[in-house]
Amino acid sequence: MKIAILSRNSKLYSTRRLIEAGRTRGHTVRILDPLRCYMRIAADGFSLHYKGKPITGFDAVIPRIGASVTRYGTAVLRQLEFMGTYTPNPSDAILRSRDKLRAHQLLASQGIDMPVTVFGDNPDDTQDLLSMLGPPPHVVKLNEGAQGAGVILTEKASASRGVVEALRGLYANFIVQEFIGEAEGADLRCFVVGDRVVAAMRRQAADGDFRSNLHLGGTAAMAEASPQEQDVAVRSARALGLAVAGVDLIRSQRGPLVLEVNSTPGLEGVEGVCGVDVAGTIIQHLEQAIR
């Protein structure tokens, strides 16, 4: 099998592990920087070039597209899809996952529970909008933020209004959510491949923070996801059209709540903490999908 990995940095842990896993299983693996890809689109067919040469013959492509190049990266991925290349995470699924509002609407439409979320535009509606959440604390999130960036905890109603008004002044798109205090700064990252959770880890926020992202100083430990949590994680990935996903849940008094579905989840944390060959499992999924 000939596999392409769309990645801007071949030295990143996740990219290196996917290369290693693919080659260990006897496949040809090539890294393509999406920003060096360019394309021809016409009624007589699709073509893709990379550094002056045509790209052909790939059986599968694994997208490792960073948030900063989402639009161009997904355009390249879409071109490969039209050329008949299989991908576990199609371009439209990645775009769904990176639009928090759209993702939450899709999840809610499938009956998947999450923190109550509100979205509005007019400043005259701010007070009523926030009242739909109940009393603070509230969590304000940039709609396309990633890795904990653009996430603000407001502990007073005046602070919630102030942050909302400031973001509107910057013409930023954002959502506001209820704060789940009983989670105590912890979440559960479930790594989904295909139709199952292959690994799970509990992430704990650093002292003084409520965001559990590891690169922000959070810690992680291997965890066991309950059958209900596994079901929610798999359904969440499926709702967005993803076959490979990191689904972040919090454990609440009303059951597991989905915070986010990540279409480009890092492998270093989960493989290091859980001792699971997640990269190999992804390659196995490709093998099964294109038989």
Curated annotation (Swiss-Prot):
EC main group: ligase
Reported cofactor(s): Mg(2+); Mn(2+)
Similarity remark: Belongs to the RimK family.
Residue sites binding Mn(2+) 1 per the record: 248, 260
The name this protein goes by in its record: Probable alpha-L-glutamate ligase
PANTHER family (UniProt xref): RIBOSOMAL PROTEIN BS6--L-GLUTAMATE LIGASE, RIBOSOMAL PROTEIN S6 MODIFICATION PROTEIN
GO CC term, one of those recorded: cytoplasm
GO BP terms in the entry: protein modification process; SOS response; translation
Binding positions for ATP per the UniProt entry: 141, 178-179, 187, 211-213
Entry keyword set: ATP-binding, Ligase, Magnesium, Manganese, Metal-binding, Nucleotide-binding, Protein biosynthesis
Binding residue positions for Mg(2+) 1: 248, 260
Keyword Magnesium: yes
Lineage: Bacteria, Pseudomonadati, Pseudomonadota, Gammaproteobacteria, Lysobacterales
InterPro entries for this protein: ATP-grasp, ATP-grasp_RimK-type, ATP_grasp_subdomain_1, RimK, Rimk_N, Rp_bS6_RimK/Lys_biosynth_LsyX
Start and end residues of each ATP-grasp domain: 104-287
Record note on cofactor: Binds 2 magnesium or manganese ions per subunit.
Gene: rimK
Residues reported to bind Mg(2+) 2: 260, 262
MF-aspect GO terms: ATP binding; metal ion binding; ribosomal S6-glutamic acid ligase activity
EC nos: 6.3.2.-
